[in-house]
Amino acid sequence: MNSNLRKKVTLAGLLVSIGIVYGDIGTSPLYVMKAIVNENGGIAHVSREYIVGSISLILWTITLLTTVKYVLIALKATNHGEGGIFSLYALVRKKAKWLVIPALVGGAALLADGTLTPAVTVTTAIEGLKNMKFGNDIPVPNQNSVIMITIVILLFLFSIQRMGTSIIGKTFGPIMLVWFTFLGLTGIMNLSHDWSLLEALNPLLAVKILFSPANKVGVLILGAVFLATTGAEALYSDVGHVGKGNIMGSWPYVFICLALNYLGQGVWILENPNYHAGATDFNPFFEALPSQWKFFAIILATLAAIIASQALITGSFTLVSEASGLKFLPRMKIIYPSTEQGQLFIPSINKMLCAATIGIVFLFRTSEHMEAAYGLAITVTMLMTTVLLFEYLSLRKVNLSLRLVFLLLFGAIETMFLISSLAKFLHGGYVTVIIAAFIGAIMYIWYFGNKIRDKREAENAYVRLDEFTTMLSNLSHDESIPLYATNLVYMAKVKYNKFIKRDMLYSILDKRPKRAHAYWFVTVNVTNEPFTAEYAVNTYGTKNVINVQLYLGFKQQQKVNVYLRQIVHDLIKDGTIESQPQEYTTTPGRDVGDFSFVIVNDVISPQTQLRSYEKFLVEARVWLQNLSSNPASWFGLDYADTVIERVPLILGNQRRQHITRIAPKKFEDIKKKLQAEGELKE
């Protein structure tokens, strides 16, 4: 979406926001009331008090968590227009070091939840086809058929990610607008049979049902109720695509349609107490519709489920990209399938999401079992977001009393939801917990492994680059040494614009002198601003030793090869460096020479002296680095002349062992002794 639509509240912006932002929360009516009925033992065991109280819980949960916390408060906590837990962390990370923990935990849980959402939404939609007659045939006679159709849809969905979503994305808005309108109209249709159910708007009934004997599971009902607001975190994450104004403008319509549908389903349940009595495999969302509407509803629900899944998949790509930029995750190969900002595709993440989602479908088989596991991870994310928002409010100088009210209110509500959702652990919630723990462990190892490495590196690991400029200039003009490259580029972190790792200069000067017309030391700095693309240079008074500081936003693609060619051209044009005319070229008048890029990779040295815990983290971090994408891909150097050199990483106090030469006479004595013992032959 272009920047104008993000900034302004327009009809187009409102429509796009409906298509992009509300997919997850908009498909919740497919399974929330079903889960609530099943919590109490089936439709034969629910009373009016239970249904009215449950709907009241749903409506006030959406009001407090989605409307108040996310729409009215969180949307103001944007980082240059971008939202989500990592953008929020980037805003507050300077306040306290410990804030990295809620960011890591919340981000890992959000990514884990992403494996379950496509599975549960698509499966629920397709289950509406089960046992439906088309003439004399029943195309989907059993759950196995549902599973196969679901798998085909999911495989298709994941397979088209590489192509980008710019074209199909344009249809999301109209389809979701039809979907929400359909939810509202069908809700009114059923609600018109019993307007008295509007008493569910009374918040006292929401509190009362938690302790009522009509509710057989007590506060554990919140585990099912929470499913109605799982999409609130996605709403915050997607603010960068459409702008907070368009979300605030479209949310009232979406909320009204959702509320009407939940109320309508409640009326139908109370009107049909003996419908499939004792059964738990029916869905009140579809059953509440006239029979002639069901096929249309299933098609529309399937499209809505696909859109919700698509939004979540692309959201996962964005989340991983941001995590990499903040050094929470290893660098991965990122593909930008369109020219639109924010359109990205991460092949490795796509494969893992696809495998996990399909695995979940095969593991749980029915939407009922998936619902039992759904929501546990996202409660953790919401709780972590509350902690970070509390710090953000402090950053904004909000009154301490108001901040404490915010923390205690939403912290208490979300803690209750978390406790109730823990009951789902043994019913499948363990799957997302395991996935979240796995992702969280990778993030922890990568982040703190980097921290330990930076902190414990030997003091002599860095040298002043400006002290070697004369030597590098002399090497550049020494024609007795073969020319290695016109431009020799090292992807090297230059600290404070002057300190560089000794390994870089060792590679140029000591291993085998590498002569080049210009030596480039490029540092990529990831900024808090999402789309920064700037650079600064320092030549140290020379024409051939250049320190380049690239400043790229955490959402910006790192095409170093492209950027550097532009920088060289700029510096030649303003006379900062000498022209590099090419005698042999397909481009007449070309004044920029060839490039050779060098990337130095670390290998743990046996001389490293660290505590066992620190050594484990650093070794695990190096292992993850070797498993992840080639660093050349990360820097956009796939098609450039790139050399990767391995150097020993020495951390902490160095353990130096001295070897002593044996005196000739002593060596002869040892030799004779070994010969006498038969261990050494003449």
From Swiss-Prot:
Keywords assigned: Cell membrane, Ion transport, Membrane, Potassium, Potassium transport, Symport, Transmembrane, Transmembrane helix, Transport
Main location (coarse class): membrane
A GO-annotated cellular component: plasma membrane
GO terms, molecular function: potassium ion transmembrane transporter activity; symporter activity
Membrane topology of this protein: Multi-pass membrane protein
One Pfam assignment: K_trans_C
Superkingdom as given in the UniProt entry: Bacteria
Listed transmembrane segments: 13-33, 55-75, 98-118, 138-158, 171-191, 217-237, 250-270, 295-315, 344-364, 375-395, 405-425, 428-448
Subcellular locations according to the entry: Cell membrane
Catalysis performed (reactions): K(+)(in) + H(+)(in) = K(+)(out) + H(+)(out)
Function of the protein: Transport of potassium into the cell. Likely operates as a K(+):H(+) symporter.
HAMAP family from the UniProt entry: Kup (MF_01522)
PANTHER family: K+ POTASSIUM TRANSPORTER, OSMOTIC STRESS POTASSIUM TRANSPORTER
Family the entry assigns: Belongs to the HAK/KUP transporter (TC 2.A.72) family.
Protein name, UniProt field: Probable potassium transport system protein Kup
Species assigned in the record: Lactobacillus gasseri (strain ATCC 33323 / DSM 20243 / BCRC 14619 / CIP 102991 / JCM 1131 / KCTC 3163 / NCIMB 11718 / NCTC 13722 / AM63)
